[in-house]
Amino acid sequence: SPEGEMVLIGGGAFAPGLGVRHENMFGLSTWAPDGQVEIEIIAESEGEASVQGSVGIGEVTNPDLDLEVNFQEFQAMDRRDVSARLSGDLTIQGPYIRPVVSGDLFVDEGTLFVEEFQRAVDVVDLLASVDTTQIDLSSVLESSNRFLENVRMENTTLTVQRNSWIRSARMNVELDGQLDVLWDRQTQELALVGELEALRGSYGALGRQFQVDGGTLRFLGTS
């Protein structure tokens, strides 16, 4: 088994599926004879993200992951359908081909474009019950990477903070609130439970434009 250290200084990478470039990357990996690799990675994209933990390479094509991820106002996505700057902490555990992600995330700033994201949502006076089983996630992460294709998200809380918007041809609304998230990329199952408060914005209906100064989006999860 390999033994020793590998260091990356001043690296960069572009993630086409996320639409962001990571810069000023630093990485340190320490390889032990028993097949355990201790890693530390830091990357910048507006804010900063760091990864620490261990990777077991007993099975090279399916290493075992035990990682902690921290975001500090990190530009995690910048796509045509969704843009998000995140803070918070996640853990990534389990085999590479079926990892489990859990933790607490905060959306410091974000925008979701409804038509692009293909949401089947009927909003009436900004009071809605959303069936999250109807959300098409196929465009979020287009990749043949087995990690991304099979990732599961459990016991995860998403806190949406001010300066987070949902936008469509009829709607432009700032949101605030908290959701519990359960997502299985492999089966395309998504459950969101919680409420988002509409803080301000506008909504068009029947040929008229209405100003929004309150209301609630309720997410009820899967049936």
Predicted region positions:
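Strand-loop-strand
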Residues: 4-223
